[in-house]
Amino acid sequence: MRKYLYCENGFVEKSQWMPNCWVNVECPDQSDFEFLTKELKVPEAFLEDIADMDERPRTDTEDNWLLTIIRIPLQQQGSIPYITIPIGIITNNEIIVTVCYHSTEMIPDFIDHTRRKGIIVPNKFELILRLIYSSAVWFLKYLKQINNDVAAAEKELERSIRNEDLLRLMKLQKTLVYFNTSIRGNEVMVGKLQSIFQEKDYQNRDLVEDVVIELKQAYN
């Protein structure tokens, strides 16, 4: 599923693509792949990289394209309620595409937030930074829930040692490790992006500082 988003005091969905809009793709199907690779000429290798669940935060280039991969938190059903997943931001001079192979809460919330606050996102660097900032906000939200779950599991273990409580605690602790690794990786990406987007038009030190502070707060 893809959406074409234009920044008009926040991101507003439109019916078709035009240069400099943001194309957000979640759970891409064959139609989305064809649009991205045939119409926008997005490198297929980038889409394959984003599909790898183990991809770490990094950047890559091909011709005039830049791929930025960050990791974001995801709440799911099952024995492991929280995981982290990759999301790819693919850009060139006229195109901004985000691709995620899962349906997330973060992206719709981010879009709604820009509308509520009337946020203007003037360029691709700021969009990437704001998405990283949003990831930190959601990491913090889920970390609070995880810490509450850990405290509850530890309390249960004090009463009686049961295998299911011990396994639950181990899974939650493993999730914390994954979260911390992803947050640190995203923080490193901010520095890399600053070195890539050095032109004056891309400079926004206040936003960079806010992103780094939020990531450090999320780091457990």
Identify the meaning behind each predicted range.
Residues 1-219:
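Peripheral, non-transmembrane regulatory/ligand-interaction domains of membrane transport proteins
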